[in-house]
Amino acid sequence: MKVKLITVGKLKEKYLKDGIAEYIKRLGRFTKFESIELTDEKTPDNASEAENKAILDKEGQRILAKVGDRDYVIALAIEGKQFPSEQFAKELEQATLRGYSDITFIIGGSLGLSPKVKKRANQLMSFGLLTFPHQLMRLILVEQIYRAFMIQQGSPYHK
């Protein structure tokens, strides 16, 4: 199995890079992990709805170009389903049991995700109604992926 994380925008903060690198290293015991960082579009101040849509479409095209036809896709979206950690672990396990060898997570840019990306997703997932910086969300998501693997192993990490 391979886990892929597609994100829009550059990760700048060293402490976040270090945290993500640590969890990716830990995940190496269980799976191959690939992180794909895509360029974000510049959003002008006071952008019109049409400009925002065009930006979402461009970023969406870049995202979808990195998604395999047979990937199980989980896109982060505020309107997505919320999971307790144990259920999230089961969701990942079920995806592999259904024959998916690659699980791809997507975190959009500052405007979110295009409708085409959301439509392609097998699952929309939410971490709640709170707003998180997209860079911090990467660390939170990678930790939760690691936690899911530890839950599957019956490890006390989750306790």
From Swiss-Prot:
It is an enzyme of class 2 (transferase). It comes from the Bacteria. GO terms for molecular function: rRNA (pseudouridine-N3-)-methyltransferase activity. Signal peptide: none annotated. It holds the Pfam family SPOUT_MTase. Keywords: Cytoplasm, Methyltransferase, rRNA processing, S-adenosyl-L-methionine, Transferase. It catalyses: pseudouridine(1915) in 23S rRNA + S-adenosyl-L-methionine = N(3)-methylpseudouridine(1915) in 23S rRNA + S-adenosyl-L-homocysteine + H(+). One of its GO terms (cellular component) is cytoplasm. CDD domains: RlmH-like. Its EC number is 2.1.1.177. It is found in: Cytoplasm. S-adenosyl-L-methionine binds at residues 76, 108, 127-132. PANTHER family: METHYLTRANSFERASE, RIBOSOMAL RNA LARGE SUBUNIT METHYLTRANSFERASE H. Homodimer. Specifically methylates the pseudouridine at position 1915 (m3Psi1915) in 23S rRNA. Belongs to the RNA methyltransferase RlmH family. This is Ribosomal RNA large subunit methyltransferase H.
